[in-house]
Each structure stands twice: as C-alpha cells, then as structure tokens.
Amino acid sequence: MSGTNRVAANLNMLFTNLPLLQRYGAAASAGFKLVEVSIPYTEPAEKLREAADEYHLKHTLINAPPGNWDDGFRGLASLKSAKKEFRKSLDTAIEYAKALGCCRVHVMAGIPKSDDDLENAHQTYSENVRFAAEKFKEHKLICLIEPINKYTIPGYHLNNYEDAMDVIQMDQSNNLKIQYDTFHAQQINGQIGAIMRKLKDYIGYIQVAQVPNRGACDTRGEIDYHFIFDEIRSINPSWVIGAEYLDAKPSFNWIENMSLSF
C-alpha cells in the first residue's frame, strides 16, 4: 500500500508467550516486515540477526543499554554517577545496531536519585545525549530521545517535550531526534496531533499504544487512533510506527483497518 505509514512490531512487548528469538517468526507470520527490539542485549547480536534474516525482517529501532533493569535503572544519560557506564553503553549499542542493520538507537534518560545526580541531571543529560548524537553520526546511526510520562516511570528525567527541544536545539550534530510515543504524549500534555505538527521537523520515529492500559490501537481507551493515524499520514507518511503495546497473543486487524501497512 503506497503512501501509508509502515508498522514495526515491538518484540519485547508483543508475542511475550514466546522466547525472544521465536518472536521473529511470529511477527513474520502476522505479516510484519519491520521489527523493533527495545532491549536486544539478552541475546547475542548475531543470533538476533540470524532470526531476522531467516524471516526477511528488518530492524527499525533498538535502545542503548539502560543499566540494570531489575535494579530499577531506566537509562543512564542523566546520571552523573554513571558517566563511564553510559559511554561504554554507547559502544555496545553501536555494536548491536551495526550487526542488526538498524539505523536508530534510543538513548534513555534514566531516573536520577542521589542528591548529586539530581542536582546535575539536566546538564549531565544534555552533555551525554549530545555526545551520543555525535558518536552515532560517525556510524550513520540516528540518536533518538523520548519523553516518558511521569505515571509510567515516576522520576524519569525526560518527561516533557520542552526539555527535549532544549537539548535538540543545543545539539550541533543535527543527528538528535524525538521518538514520539503517543501513549506518553497523551499523558504528558494531550494535544497529540497539535504537538506532533509542531515538532514534525524534529521527530525521527513514532510509537503507539492505547491509554491507559497500553493495549492495541483498536482497543477502548482515551485515544482515537483513526484520527491520529490520519494526522500522522498527513504530516509524514514515511514515518515508521512502532507497535509498542502489551499483548502476548496479538491480533493486527487494526493495521489494515486504519489504512496502515506492514
């Protein structure tokens, strides 16, 4: 279907009744040609690439290593105390992105907790993501940052679009973009379409899920996705849309019903 946005399956949140490597086959069987893997580091990069190649799937997005998830880390970029670990995480992200043939890497901000981290969070974050954008540019990778709402991840440093734009406008690499997730946008400020139009030149990737339960786009909730997808299509039909919602055994009728494509 020409002139329509394509949808990528998030393999960390969909098909969760299967091990990660088996989710590639499930995504392909559902019709997908694009996949995103937020946290690919539980498997060797070559195994993920083999699974993708077997089913003719292309990776559209990965996250940089976020720190120890089980210990409560949700990224490292705003943590002064984790500067060395953050820089090392970028090398790992580059290694995986290149192995997977993926051109986008999302750098998570993290949750500053110590007094020193809290006091220096914004400066640390700004310096770190601009460093990441420059470093990724050398490898032809796009650096993404994503505002996340305060209800889903309390204390997350980047929780609004104003701060995201402040950092982007200080970036000299022209390689720092917003990952615009409608699930978060609705809970940060609403006005999903209006904010998206305002930020259209700075958006590098879209993600979607229904609010409040983070379900599929055709489930009941706060967001009218027929309207939102019409808006996305009219603004930029080349944006890739990541289906980042929770569903162990999903159905994807909504993709065709809302005039999107695989």
Curated annotation (Swiss-Prot):
UniProt key word Isomerase: yes
Organismal lineage: Eukaryota, Metazoa, Ecdysozoa, Nematoda, Chromadorea
A single BP term in Gene Ontology: glyoxylate metabolic process
Family label: Belongs to the hyi family.
Function field: Catalyzes the reversible isomerization between hydroxypyruvate and 2-hydroxy-3-oxopropanoate (also termed tartronate semialdehyde).
Recorded catalytic activity of this chain's protein: 3-hydroxypyruvate = 2-hydroxy-3-oxopropanoate
InterPro entries: HyI-like, Sugar_Epim/Isomerase, Xyl_isomerase-like_sf, Xyl_isomerase-like_TIM-brl
Protein name as it appears in the record: Putative hydroxypyruvate isomerase
Key word Isomerase present: yes
Family matches, as SUPFAM superfamilies: Xylose isomerase-like
One Pfam family of this chain: AP_endonuc_2
Molecular function as annotated in GO: hydroxypyruvate isomerase activity
EC number: 5.3.1.22
